[in-house]
Amino acid sequence: MKVAVAGAGAVGRSVTRELVENGHDITLIERNPDHLDAAAIPEAHWRLGDACELSLLESIHLEEFDVVVAATGDDKVNVVLSLLAKTEFAVPRVVARVNDPRNEWLFNDAWGVDVAVSTPRMLASLIEEAVTIGDLVRLMEFRTGQANLVEITLPDNTPWGGKPVRKLQLPRDAALVTILRGPRVIVPEADEPLEGGDELLFVAVTEAEEELSRLLLPSM
């Protein structure tokens, strides 16, 4: 997967490092020469320049990228880059970092943002989710204990379509906490039917993740 990351600060580098380790092709854009350190992540393609300048985005052929990540420390830059990526280059997935919660209302599809997040680990997970429908994605590791917040997006042709939540025989130490369906946030009652495209959020121990995948994604 080709990913362009804007911002080589702590967040941008953290995201880039994690995605590189997972085998993705990353271009890291930074406008401050003092932050440009190709030796820090030699596997990434480093570019010096302003991510809000069309000429720079054209020079890296942004239209060929699968995902753009606006990870700078400036919300204005992140919003402008998101809009350019979506409207000028038709990038399929745009993920943006929100620095100031008061600006969160700006980070929506009207400004080209598909997903707005605020923590590096969740940022990296949601970037990868762009091409991992039908995979288990670990969104967050809790500080205490061994539990994680994990997400599974059911494929459109899921065999679980139309079946109620109570039919799920979940592994021990795994709990379904939320179903995201379009704009809705659904509390998973026993009789709630599942649908293709549902995003299921679980709290589960690491050992239960593989069993969850086998249960919900048997053909994957």
Curated annotation (Swiss-Prot):
Keyword NAD: yes
GO CC aspect terms: plasma membrane
GO biological process: potassium ion transport
Xref: Pfam families: TrkA_C (PF02080), TrkA_N (PF02254)
UniProt xrefs under PANTHER family: POTASSIUM CHANNEL PROTEIN 2-RELATED-RELATED, TRK SYSTEM POTASSIUM UPTAKE PROTEIN TRKA
Function: Part of a potassium transport system.
Protein name: Trk system potassium uptake protein TrkA
Protein's organism: Mycobacterium tuberculosis (strain ATCC 25618 / H37Rv)
Lineage: Bacteria, Bacillati, Actinomycetota, Actinomycetes, Mycobacteriales
